[in-house]
């Protein structure tokens, strides 16, 4: 059958002589599971084959095997079920297209597919080859083809293709990523041809240097399937992005600072081969990426560039301006100048100086105001312009000063200053001194009577009585043994090259001289001695006369007048006269003795004068303050904290025109015209001078407030009254608020000036006053009495019964009325008494007493007739009233036994008596203070032991059974006495200027106790003595005695009043006591001029003590708790901010504890400084930016913050002082820019600025910044302000990565190369913004483990075993040997079980093992493990093959010790006969010997160093490792060098150095006080002392050299082997000696110069003389020669 089929097929093929039957399809087609694929297919058949019924298309799967039908166009039922619905014939059979589409591919669809088409039974064809289909689950990576040559500027195509293609899939893509979209174009091509099926994307790029290092990624995606492939571009290019980085960016570069310039290249391929540096276009000849200036100088300023070169080319960076921040002063013209010339000083700065420099000029360290330009012009200079000038340049980063330049102005001598003195201390001596001011120095000549006596040029009168000394521009003549001829006129002449001047003075030889010791100006209490000296010869009867203020004070034989304690009365003009026999000296010149004393308590009065002339207001206030002091005190008058007037003349623009101030010495008179309310109050007069201060206060009442009652002060009840408060004030208070007082008590407050009483009631009658409420308070008006008239009210009539001494009744009638009422008392119709005639009754049983509106009637020996109706009538001009009562006489009374006066605890019996006797059945009731006593119903009340609470009024009531009326007894009072109890003693001190102490002792006692007050066992006050008697004992004490109370007032308490007071209370029954401590506050600190001062002012702090023992006081000061030297006062010549602290002084009396004052805080005001402007950004949500400006200022500065030219914030009263805070909510790019902060205060201002960068761009990593290797990571650039057209540039570890519209980087498979720092830049129309770098950490398991070992053979065999590994995170490492753990990284402090020392580092473990036994079994295992995996490695220690050096006794030996170094062979074997050993010291060859030992007997310090040996053995030469030999020795004598600042001696340096091994401990002592040490914890710290301690050296810099820092300093050096010390004097004494030595050198130089000039003149004169003689000899010789020649010529002619 097959043979027949083949024959028929051949016949059909060759029937027409051509091959037209065939099928074309790809050999291979690939697809992905779940996707689809298309097998392109075309077929052909001969043209002459008829097609009548169409063509049947059949696709088979595995035709040679299973032969499953995939497609059957004739009978679809024949299709295998697994292909039904998934296979589709896509071709048109009429067009001979037979494409097969397979959908929903599965892996089992892989295999061979064959196409068969049938036209008829005899015309059919089968594609035997078929198409192989491969279906996989994951796609294979795309195929990338790249050009061979890549270079910058070329355009190249990069092709990426994949065999997977399915047109029916919509989610299929083949894309290039990582390219720059602005310089590249992509195109795509799909091939569905019988020749092949593939999908290709072409990337066309214009290459640039930025493409170097770019990773191109081609990614294929089909539904959920994807694959990718990367290619790394290497584009050769010249260096790009060359720039210079400055190490000192952001601050000033000062002279001497190290500066590093780094040439950074952004990109270069190949690598940079050369870097050249240039400054200002001139090649510096320096190569390398880094240019280091170890010490910046003037010439280092300039514009720097660097040029980077590789094989592709070179690039020069942009110039970087380097400015060395320094200044130099240049002068035009240079050198000394003459007066009236113009001088210009230029403050020159190096090149590349910034434009915003600010200049300041200083002369002699004093700032010149209004000199802020780079040049300083001095037109028409004078001698006052001579001095040292320097300039200061300043910018935002700091300031720097130039070196000083000396400006010398030359001028002729001024008028000389000629003075004369008489010295009679050791013989009569006259001194004449002449000094002059000139430039250059002048020649000074002193003459008398036309005769030159002395000159500073050396032309002197060599008189043995004369002693001459001179200095520059100064001449001093001392004349001994004065004679009358020495009197007369003396003349001083001064001459220099520019002119001369003279002055004259009369000198008298025989004149007395008055000397005052210690000075003509002393402080009160100081001892003063006045001495009288004259030229008279001493005689036995020499007399001295003393005169004070022209009047004879004393006459006697003593030449001295002693004032043991000078007082103000001793001040005056003194002179003396001497008389010796018949000779009398002239009077001495008057000398004024001035005695200084602090201000006494001022006399201060304040009064109001009323002008009775009737012209004008007629009111004026007079304030007069007078004080006694010398020097005159500065007076200040203060009112409500404000200065009203001072004794210093000043213009007060804010003072009232009504105030007139008159000033005299120590007196201040202030007159206030028409005083108003604001002028009232307490005025304080302060007086202060350099020795102390005092004050006094006075109250001034201007009567500016007047109360007026209308219509009258006396009104009838029910009428209307208006009370008006009239206030005379300068500025009306709006709204006004008034306080009204009634009978001295606050009545009402409000804004009404008038209070209306409508209607007026009797209760309104009172004393009224008012005042205006102000902040400082105001005086009350004068009180006004309001009287209210009304008729009498019904009188109050009462009757009292007293039977204590017999029956007595008292009738009292009182009434309320005004005016006073006429009172009459009646019994029935019988008039008993009136207040007009109170003694009207004539009998003595009835007595009447009358007071205002009160009438009292006493009726004694009451009888039944006194019972009846009593009534009282009251009458005045406005009306009358009456009242009545019925009085019945009752017969009971109370009898007390033993007495109503009782002692506490005593028994008492009270009996109820009735006059008619006791009836049977009478009942009794007892009452205490009106309260019934239930426990007693008998006629007797017994109290066994009476107490205080049982004292009071007792009465009884007797009720007879046969009567209805009870008999009520009058009350009887029981008084109970008791011992003193509850003694209290309180001690108070008022703080007003009067200083008043109060001691109050009170007690509960009956009878009143006798009180005694003791102080230190001394009776101070007592109730036994009268107040006058006690006050007379001490005028400062005032005693007030009240019942059971004793008050002691101490006026101006003194130090001796301090202490414990005891109060003792006693009466006849007992005693008690109490104690209290009294603080007199007699020690007080006063601050002059004020406790609030400006920085730089002089401040005096004085310890004021109120004490009667001023001479025996000792003082101690405390500054901020630190004790200072003791003195009554301390002076701060120039107060600093550091001085702003609390001060207190302590005063001690002999034998008593010191008394401390209350602290006083010194407030130092200064201009704003340390202005700082910073900003903070919220890192999470970026919703807030905080701009913070702070400054150091006192008083607090007014801060303003500006953005550009717009003010954005300023400080207010509610702000934190010296702080300004600006919060920017949701900041935008418009908020970025330059912010300026200014600080203003009354003392100055400061400014600073800052560039605000919001940093709104940030890099975010997903899923996190730390991922395991191989995991995908997406790096996103987030910028909330980015526009849609923004471009994103990415940088990795500072290198450009890519740029494009994509805001994210995707790493599908991360590797270690992806780790590092990423940051991005966003470019849009708003500008360019950069993010901060974000770190990406790639985690991976440990790898590349290395276990190594090496030996350290110094003195013993030591092996170091080290294991390292590469891992992230760091691995935990374990080192083991034979299964035993020797070391572990997580036990870094272990000692390896005593085996050796362990060192742990990141991914490294190091073990030092001593005395390792070499040989087998030395296998070590290192294991490293982290969370991602572990790794281990092994290492066997090698056997020892090298020689080593051993030392005996060791390598650290003391100097002088014997030492042997041995060259030890491997294994400890000895040397053979042909061996030799060579020793080396510090790499220098010493010697060779056959023995391996190098001996030192003994070793010295110079032999310390590195030693190693070389052994020449028969087997070859080998060299040991070097060992270090240390020779130990004690310190040598230290070198102590002292440096003192030559200008003013304010700074100094002590430098101590020593040689020792081991290093020495250095200490520096002044006396017994430790000043510094190189052991930091030993030395005390002081702010003005800076200590530096390099090895074996100690340096101490003292910035403020004071007396406490001067003295002998000792530097001591010690180590374990010994110690040594050296000393030197440190202070200004050395500076003074240096200055004296400099002056001596100047004089010697002058003398040497003069001598050289003189020798030169002599030599010149000798030379001239010799030259003249030689010339004459030469002329004579010439003449003789001429004559000789003439003779010879004549002889020749004759011949």
From Swiss-Prot:
Membrane-spanning segments: 1640-1660
Described purpose of this protein according to its UniProt entry: Macrophage-restricted adhesion molecule that mediates sialic-acid dependent binding to lymphocytes, including granulocytes, monocytes, natural killer cells, B-cells and CD8 T-cells. Plays a crucial role in limiting bacterial dissemination by engaging sialylated bacteria to promote effective phagocytosis and antigen presentation for the adaptive immune response. Mediates the uptake of various enveloped viruses via sialic acid recognition and subsequently induces the formation of intracellular compartments filled with virions (VCCs).
Protein name per its UniProtKB record: Sialoadhesin
Organism for this UniProt entry: Mus musculus
UniProt gene name: Siglec1
Extracellular face of the membrane: 20-1639
GO cellular component, one term: plasma membrane
Pfam family, one: ig
GO molecular function list: carbohydrate binding
